[in-house]
Curated annotation (Swiss-Prot):
Recorded family membership: Belongs to the WASH1 family.
Bias (Basic and acidic residues): 386-402
Family matches, as PANTHER family: CXYORF1 (PTHR23331), WAS PROTEIN FAMILY HOMOLOG 2-RELATED (PTHR23331:SF5)
GO term, biological process aspect, one: Arp2/3 complex-mediated actin nucleation
Stated name of the protein: WASH complex subunit 1
The species this protein was found in: Bos taurus (Bovine)
Region (VCA) residue spans: 353-471
Keywords from the UniProt entry: Actin-binding, Cytoplasm, Cytoplasmic vesicle, Cytoskeleton, Endosome, Membrane, Protein transport, Transport
Length: 471
């Protein structure tokens, strides 16, 4: 048992059928023909068996798909006559494996049966004698001397060609008495004539490529129009949608569910897209912080009245902890009940019901003050008085006391001072504007206007900064 000899086959093929060599003896030719036919039979049997297996596999896959189709068709026929709404949930992922199965060749795993050992036969016949004439005839049909070397490409050579092997120096490459390399570029020159030859710099300057001509827009001074960039954004358009007047409910329709109700508010459509449409956020029912307006009466914070009835105005403006207390509040109108009577018996240390937590139990003075200011909404909502207003009130009170003190004298200077004070109040808008016209006569008023204001009499020297006249 010996392995087969050299086989002539194509590259990449699993099977290789051997060829029968010419000029064999009769017994050798018969044996090789039988072996080749037997090998070909094995190869063909293997190929057809593999094809049959692949066909059976494809048939089983088609049968499974057909069963799924018939099952889906039966389900559709079952629910076709139903009048109830049916929800169909589609899978979020495509029903396919994450990694696709690679395609396998039908000849994957096939082995060449020719690699198996075949029986060795002994032939008794002798070789035929050599015939020279027959060999010469075969040379006409079977070329023996084939030049497999690729032919070199014909290159256009300007010089003498390749360098000879007997050149020993670089000067042998140059033409006598010149700088021309004849092996690179052959030129006809007289070495003894002393002709000036072109240098390599000059030759390079001649062969230097020139720039292309300027475009027509530059050469002819033409003005190119600016190209408007194309808009590639997707802008869907529904066009003219006709208004169809149909009834909202059509009973007893085949294939239409009766228990399905559609909501009229389906939200904004997806086409055409509204670039500036902002969806409305859901409303959350939360408690809105009301501005804090504490009432200070007799050193005790009073609770704010309940929300349903309108709260009466506070008898005194709110005062923070870090600000000195204001003068006694004015009396409330006769129509409103007094709050101080009800809350007078309450202890100052007890917390007031309904007051914010920060006021009842402050954690730190500064944080509580800032938080109460934020809840109150600032000066505009809390109706807090500034220090400047309190100074003005103090000035008014002192002026009134001075007017009362000077009005008791009855002299000319005190009357003049009173008239000037009333005149200045009317001009500045801080008092009644008719104060100057209530005098005994117009001449006295004109005289009071022409006299500059005098400093108030009996003014203590330590209160000059606080009692300056307001312009």
């Amino acid at each position: 048992m010996t392995p087969t000899g050299t086989q002539h086959s194509l590259a990449g093929q699993t099977y290789a059928v051997p060829l029968i060599q010419p000029d064999l003896r009769r017994e050798e030719a018969i044996q090789q023909v039988a072996d080749a036919l037997q090998y070909l039979q094995k190869v063909s049997g293997d190929i057809f068996s593999r094809i049959s297996q692949r066909v059976e596999l494809s048939r089983s896959q088609l049968q499974a798909i057909g069963e799924r189709v018939s099952l889906a068709q039966a389900k559709i026929e079952k629910i076709k006559g139903s009048k109830k709404a049916i929800k169909v949930f589609s899978s979020a992922k495509y029903p396919a494996p994450e990694r696709l199965q690679e395609y396998g060749s039908i000849f994957m795993g096939a082995q060449d049966p020719g690699l198996q050992r075949r029986p060795r036969h002994r032939i008794q016949s002798k070789h035929r004698p050599l015939d020279e004439r027959a060999l010469q005839e075969k040379l006409k049909f079977f070329p023996v001397c084939v030049n497999t070397k690729p032919e070199p490409e014909d290159e256009a050579e300007e010089g003498l060609g390749g360098l000879p092997s007997n050149i020993s120096s670089v000067s042998s490459l140059l033409l006598f008495n010149t700088t021309e390399n004849l092996y690179k570029k052959y030129v006809f020159l007289d070495p003894l004539a002393g002709a000036v030859t072109k240098t390599h710099v000059m030759l390079g300057a001649e062969t230097e490529e020139k720039l292309f001509d300027a475009p027509l827009s530059i050469s002819r001074r033409e003005q190119l129009e600016r190209q408007v960039p194309e808009n590639y954004f997707y802008v869907p358009d529904l066009g003219q949608v006709p208004d169809i007047d149909v009834p909202s409910y059509l009973p007893d329709l085949p294939g239409v569910a009766d228990d399905l109700m559609y909501s009229a508010d389906l939200g904004p459509g997806i086409a055409p897209s509204a670039p500036g449409a902002i969806p409305e956020l859901p409303t959350f029912h939360t408690e809105v912080a009301q501005p804090f307006k504490p009432d200070l009466e007799d050193g005790v914070l009073t609770a704010r009245p309940p929300p349903p009835p309108p709260p009466p105005p506070p008898p005194a403006p709110a005062v923070l902890m870090s600000v000195p207390p204001p003068p006694p509040p004015p009396q409330a109108p006769p129509g409103q009940p007094a709050k101080g009577d009800d809350s007078g018996g309450a202890s100052p240390s007890a917390p007031v019901q309904g007051a914010p937590k920060e006021v009842v139990d402050p954690s730190s003075g500064r944080a509580t003050l800032l938080e109460s200011i934020r809840q109150a909404g600032g000066i505009g909502k809390a109706k807090l008085r500034s220090v400047k207003e309190r100074k003005l009130e103090k000035k008014k009170q002192k002026e009134q006391e001075q007017v009362r003190a000077t009005s008791q004298g009855g002299d000319l200077m005190s009357d003049l001072f009173n008239k000037l004070a009333m005149r200045r109040k009317g001009i500045s808008g801080k008092g009644p504007g008719s104060g100057a016209s209530e005098g005994p006569g117009g001449a006295f008023a004109r005289m009071s206007d022409s006299i500059p204001p005098l400093p108030p009499p009996q003014q203590p020297p330590g209160e000059e900064d606080e009692d300056d006249w307001e312009s």
